[in-house]
A protein has these predicted regions:
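Repeat-solenoid scaffold signature
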Residues: 216-238
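Active-site entrance/lid segments in N-terminal catalytic domains of soluble metabolic enzymes
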Residues: 1-221
């Protein structure tokens, strides 16, 4: 392999969750039932949130309002699919849906569409979204960063999670655009076809480890998105 070719190949070993185990350590907790997994976060926009830091994916048949209504009882979040209408949101909010744990999701949409969507829900119910998710297959494009920057001006009080990226450079790009949380993961989802169709991807555990310092230095949270095939993978992600 020539030096010119070698610059495109990483010599570092990259790991998925299935490549590792957690080494047992001493604990004063006598039962797994005694473990408290709730956390409190204060994002860089000043918004504080408390609950179980697990988010049901915004996939069509997972990120539903019905799922959100069930999971909120355990303070678990749901990124609600972008295909859900504002009217459906309004109906469920009036039935007790808590927007502290249910997050509207958008793609690379027009900024005015997003603000109109959120305002319609707020004006109709008196409840405002606390967190929104911006989700695209490739979070490295300029237009995505521009959308984030525009929204941070238009809706500064709303916490924004955005992605997906898998490298420190991607985390820094989105952090500089103004996000409060970065969604990490490309090609690692159990039903994701991105790696198969495009050849693009990154082993999920290494993505988390490689990006952690950059996220901390930029005061954003990392959200591991994908790669979970067994319940034990949750512990590895944390």
């Amino acid at each position: 392999m020539t030096r010119e070719q070698n610059k495109f190949i990483s010599n570092e070993r990259k790991l998925a969750f299935s490549d590792v185990y957690l080494v047992p350590q001493f604990s004063s907790i006598n039962s797994r039932r005694s473990v408290n997994v709730t956390e409190e976060f204060t994002f860089k926009n000043g918004h504080s949130w408390e609950g179980t830091p697990i988010i049901a994916s915004n996939m069509d048949y997972i990120g539903t309002l019905e799922m959100a209504s069930s999971l909120q009882n355990f303070k678990i979040c749901t990124a609600v699919s972008k295909f859900v209408s504002p009217e459906d949101w309004i109906s469920h909010i009036e039935s007790g849906l808590d927007m502290e744990y249910a997050f509207p999701t958008f793609g690379l949409d027009n900024k005015n569409y997003i603000t109109d969507y959120l305002n319609h829900i707020s004006d109709s119910t008196g409840h405002t979204a606390k967190i929104i998710v911006l989700d695209v297959p490739n979070g490295y494009i300029d237009s995505f960063a521009s959308l984030i920057s525009d929204l941070k001006v238009l809706i500064p009080d709303i916490t924004i999670f955005a992605g997906n990226v898998v490298t420190p450079e991607g985390v820094e790009l989105l952090a500089n655009a103004g996000v409060d949380g970065v969604k990490l993961g490309i090609g690692s989802g159990s039903v994701c076809t991105t790696s198969i169709e495009t050849g693009v991807g990154y082993p999920q555990l290494s993505a988390i480890l490689d990006c952690a310092d950059t996220a901390k230095n930029n005061n954003v949270v990392l959200i591991s998105d994908g790669g979970i095939s067994e319940s034990g993978d949750l512990g590895k992600a944390f």
